[in-house]
Amino acid sequence: MMNTMKLPVGIDDFRKLRESDFYYVDKTRLIEQILQSWSEVTLFTRPRRFGKTLNMSMLKSFFEIGTDKSLFDGLYISGNKELCEEYMGKYPVVFLSLKSVEGTSFDEARYRIIELISREAERFKFLKDSEGLSENDKNRYNAIISVNDGKYAMDEKLLISSLQVLSQLLFTHFGRKAIIIVDEYDVPLDKAFQNGYYNEMVSLIRGIFGMALKTNEFLQFAVLTGCLRISKESIFTGLNNFRVMSITDARFDEQFGFTDNEVRKLLEDYNMSMHYNDIKEWYDGYHFGKADVYCPWDVINHVDRLCDDSDIRPQTYWINSSGNSLVRRLISKADSSTKDEIEHLIAGETIVKSIRLDLTYDEIESTIDNMWSVLFTTGYLTKAGDVKLPDSESYAYKLVIPNKEVREVFILQIQEWFKSVVANDNDTMKLLSKAIIDKDETKIAKQLNIVMGRMISILDTKAPDDMKENFYHGLLLGLLRGSNPDWLIKSNRESGDGFSDIMIMPENPDAGIVIEVKYARNIKELDTACEIAMAQIKEKRYDEALRNEGRCDIIAYGIAFSRKRCKAVGERL
């Protein structure tokens, strides 16, 4: 029987998810693991869209005083009755998600942080009337939530100490130390770096965290999440009992993302098991610690769409959820060896890289190697094994693109980059269009070889020959459309006894051009492939549609490609 529970597309509030009868993949073992391997401050680094916010919301719902304990009925953690008795609903919890902090200026972003902290503090309005708080304490609380001219009015000094002050006031009221949860701690740093106020934001975040996490005697423990582990020296200076759980750590490795068993169970629950292979190829492949996990955002979105249309094909939900500028920046900075490495990745192969897990944002683009590290930590690449470095005790990682979806991300960014490169190369494009009109096969091949020498191949080397031919067809079509805006270009146009690959109608009303594209498995076969193309044009009478338009001065080209080389043969018909 098909599950009738709603799928939680975009739902990252644990309480809402449980109260509103959404499907939930049980990750409550995370609570047990955190308590059993306790650390005063724990940072989880995972790629975006891997359930970080939902897990942090779940922690809040479990520990917070006054929680609805029935939210956890039937879940893993409810089986540990001793732990639930000791910890469930026993602590004040301060919860911040910084994922929405951004701004074109530091003042704008700083106010967003003020707003988030003040609104979180407003959840504890009972502090205003608390008998345990002194008048001075109440004044400090009121200062955190104070409003002036419709805007929250915390000054810089209070902002720095606000989380520490709030935990102190909660301790005074409840007699229990506070748990502090900060979700997506590094988003403000990312936005600051992009908008030119990185140093100011680092100073602010370091100050807030220093007061809340380092010198805070009213802290029970803290949990943070983010995509990157910003170097300890930059943000987490002086934190001694500080633990980072990254994608390379085996502990907690199944708590962010869906395991294979969880995906199989989800598909069974919705009678979707026949789609397992597609979902695995597109959304699996991430290796965290010793676990193989799927991106939960993709799985939930795709199964939800399958419920409406069982014939829908997998697509790139991850790419649509936020920007993929990091891949584009790598491509833009790539030298010839980096382009070669990207081509190996696109072809499904591995590359070997030494990885740094603790970078500052201003270091990310300082070297290509740093960019590879960030692509790994943010989920664009995943680990496929280790390689011991020669004359060293250190190991490098074998890196691979995890799945079809991320491969599509790379391909799209490469295509966008290549379009911009071609669009800015007017000289080569003009020479190409002139050579085509002049029937200069040598210059046609020369200009195409120049262009292909600059490109990053997105050709799947394992694909059948007809798919490779389609790739070169699309490449040439795109170049021709950018070479002369006055040409009318048709692709796969019915003509004679078939469909011509490319048909061009130049400004001259008497002229016409027919092109047939072929793929050659190696350079030695280019001549033969061109001859086959020319024979096909004549046999299928691909020039007929042009002649029907009154165009009688027709040039036919057979153009063959092999990797990044090509040859052109032309003939007037």
What positions do the PLM features span?
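Walker A/P-loop-proximal flanking segment of P-loop NTPase domains
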Residues: M1-N80
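P-loop NTPase motor core
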Residues: G10, S61-F126
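Extended alpha-helical interface modules used as scaffolds for assembling large macromolecular complexes
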Residues: F242-R243, Y294-R541, C566-L573
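Domain-level recognition of nuclease-like catalytic cores that cleave nucleotide substrates
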Residues: A545, E549-L573
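Amphipathic alpha-helical segments of the small helical/lid subdomains adjacent to P-loop NTPase cores
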Residues: S234-T237, M245-D304, E341
